[in-house]
Amino acid sequence: MEFSVKSGSPEKQRSACIVVGVFEPRRLSPVAEQLDKISDGYISSLLRRGDLEGKPGQMLLLHQVPGVLSERVLLVGCGKERELGERQYKEIIQKTINTLNETGSMEAVCFLTELHVKGRDTYWKVRQAVEATKDGLYIFDQFKSVKPEIRRPLRKLVFNVPTRRELNLGERAITHGLAISSGVKACKDLGNMPPNIANPAYLASQARRLADDYESITTKIIGEEEMEKLGMASYLAVGRGSRNESMMSVIEYKGNPDPEAKPIVLVGKGLTFDSGGISLKPGEGMDEMKYDMCGAASVFGTMKAIAKLGLPLNVIGVLAGCENMPGSNAYRPGDILTTMSGQTVEVLNTDAEGRLVLCDVLTYVERFEPECVVDVATLTGACVIALGHHISAVMSNHNPLAHELVNASEQSSDRAWRLPLADEYHEQLKSPFADMANIGGRPGGAITAACFLSKFAKKYNWAHLDIAGTAWKSGAAKGSTGRPVSLLVQFLLNRSGGLDAEE
C-alpha cells in the first residue's frame, strides 16, 4: 500500500473516499463540519435521524454528498472527544482500513490524523496510522494449503495534515512508520514460524540474508566449535540435548560516518524451542514455546528497520540461537557450569535456560567496547504475573539508559515499565556450591533473573527488556506481536540525533 500526506480542504479532494470523524453523541469533528456546511447540512441531518451515534468503530458510508468532489464520504465513530486516547485512535484506524477494503475503495484521503489525541502531535498520529494499518493487514498463512481469499482493493492512503508546514513532519512519519512496520513484520514472521523449520540454523540463514540485502550490514555466524574455543560453556550446555546445533548470529550495521564510533549492542534470546529440558514444562501450551526466540526476532526486525532508515549509528545485533530439549546428553539440575566470564553457576532448574545463554553472550560482546548493551528476552513467567500482557519490563544498571528506554516506549506506544535491581535480590541467587544459582525462587522472579544477568554486564551500561508477557498472544488472536521493535527503533532514532521524533 502507498502512503502519502497532503494539506487541503476536504471539499476539494477528488478521491474515491474521504474519511472524517464523528464524536459521540452525534457531534461532527471540525473537518466533518466543513463538509456539512458545503452540503447544506446533509450530514448533520443524517445524524439527527439516528443513522450514526458516533460510538467508537461505528461506520457510515455516504455516496455523492452534495458539494463534495469525492465519490464517497466515510463517517467514522470516534467516541467521546475528550476520551480519545492512543489505543482507541489506533483501533479506529484499523477498523477504518478494514471498512475501506470492504467497500472496494482503491484510494482514500484520511482526515482522522487531524483528530486531537491528548499529548500527541501530527508526527505521532501519522506514524501510528501507518503502523496500525500495516499491523491490521498482517496475515501469516505460509503453511495453509488453501490460502484464504482476502479482499484488499485499497492501494493508496493519503493522510491530511492541518497545515503545509507539517507536510515534512508527515512525510518523515510515513518513512519511519514504514521502516518500523517492515521490522515488525520480519519479527512476526520469524516468531510465527514452526520450530521444526525455525531452528538456530534458520535464524542464522535469515541473518545472512539481511547482509545480502543491505550493504551497510555484515553478518558473522558462530557455531558450537568456535563457542567451545571461546569458553561459552553455559550457552553450549543449554543446547546439548538437541540435535540442532546452537548458533550465534552477529549482525553488524555500520551507519556512523565516524569509523571509531562505539556501537550500540542489542542481544536477543533465540530459544527456537524451549521444552524446559530435563525440568520439562507441562504439555498444555508447550507449542507456544516456539515464541521463546521472540527476543532474537525483535533484534532481527530492529536491524532490518534501521538499515532501511540508514540511521547514522553503529549497531550490533546478536541473535543467540539455541534449542532446549531433554535427552541423554542434556544438562541436568545439579550441574555446575563455568561461564565465559569464569564465574560458576549451579543449575537448579533447566527451564531457567535463557539466562544461561545470555550470560555468555553478554560476556562475548565486551570485545566491541559498546556504548551500551540492551538485551531482549522472553525470560520469565514472573514478568507476566507482575505486568501482564500489556507492558514490557525494563531493568538496568544505568539510570539514564533506563530512562531512555522508558521514554522511547512512551513515544512509540510500545510501553515498558522499570523494575528495580536492588542488592537485596542478589541474596536469592546464592549457592553453597558455585558462585551463584540460576534461579532465585518465586519471589521477584523477573528481578532475580535480571540480577543474574547483571553479574555479567559490569563492564558497560546495560539494560534488560523482559518481553515474556508482550511478545506474543494466545487464544483466537494467537501469534507474535512484533514487540518491542517499535520501542527499540524509537530508542535508536532518539540516539541518532536529527531524526528525533520530538524535534
Curated annotation (Swiss-Prot):
Cofactor note: Binds 2 manganese ions per subunit.
Gene3D superfamilies: Leucine Aminopeptidase, subunit E, domain 1, Zn peptidases
Pfam families the UniProt entry points to: Peptidase_M17 (PF00883), Peptidase_M17_N (PF02789)
Key words of the record: Aminopeptidase, Cytoplasm, Hydrolase, Manganese, Metal-binding, Protease
Superkingdom: Bacteria
GO biological process assignments: proteolysis
EC number: 3.4.11.1, 3.4.11.10
Gene Ontology CC terms: cytoplasm
Positions with a binding annotation for Mn(2+) 1: 274, 351, 353
Main location (coarse class): cytoplasm
Entry keyword Membrane: no
Catalysis: reaction(s): Release of an N-terminal amino acid, Xaa-|-Yaa-, in which Xaa is preferably Leu, but may be other amino acids including Pro although not Arg or Lys, and Yaa may be Pro. Amino acid amides and methyl esters are also readily hydrolyzed, but rates on arylamides are exceedingly low; Release of an N-terminal amino acid, preferentially leucine, but not glutamic or aspartic acids
Top-level EC class: hydrolase
Family to which the UniProt record says this protein belongs: Belongs to the peptidase M17 family.
Entry protein name: Cytosol aminopeptidase
Organism: Vibrio cholerae serotype O1 (strain ATCC 39315 / El Tor Inaba N16961)
